[in-house]
A protein has these predicted regions:
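Fe(II)/2-oxoglutarate oxygenase catalytic core
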Residues: 1-154, 159-168
């Protein structure tokens, strides 16, 4: 697991993220972007993906074979104790959601997991709870707990390690 605090240095991008009232409108909705090698970033979320994975990645993703790296599955999640949003995110592994849904009823569902995943906290918040818990030693062992913090990026093998968000 890699944790980077104060990840985004571009103040204008941080301000845009903070001020965008629509950023969390589609809570939990599946979204896909093929990456800058297929189309330019058109949304703030796609620009954020570029900032994390293309401009500042510790890996040289633009040189990866496009067959291996086909794009970015992403979604936003907002958790709170109010009734408008869920208060937790249950334990799960990340997977190619579209491929899973397309094959679940075939009798031979295909489970394809990502090489790596990330969690980024784009806005300032004052919450109790909401820890990202990563079960790197298995779901029955003690998890690693990471607090939600503005401008914090967490990178981990999200398809291999079960993870969840604790109650807010």
């Amino acid at each position: 697991m890699i944790i980077v605090d104060d990840f985004i240095k571009d103040e204008s991008l941080l301000n845009e993220l903070q001020d965008d009232q629509s950023f969390f409108n589609e809570n939990g909705k599946y979204m896909w972007w093929g990456g800058p090698w297929t189309s330019p970033a058109e949304s703030l979320k796609e620009r954020l993906i570029e900032e994390i994975w293309i401009r500042n990645s510790p890996w040289d993703f633009p040189r990866y074979n496009p067959i291996t790296l086909t794009g970015f599955e992403y979604w936003t999640g907002r958790y709170s104790p109010d009734t408008q949003h869920p208060s937790t995110l249950d334990m799960h592994l990340d997977k190619d959601e579209k491929l899973w849904q397309d094959t679940i009823n075939t009798g031979a569902p295909i489970l394809s997991i990502p090489i790596i995943g990330s969690v980024f906290y784009p806005i300032e918040m004052d919450i109790d709870g909401g820890y990202l818990e990563i079960f790197s030693n298995g779901p029955d062992k003690q998890p690693e707990r990471v607090a939600a913090k503005h401008n914090r990026l967490i990178i981990f093998p999200a398809g291999e390690h079960p993870h969840r968000v604790t109650e807010v």
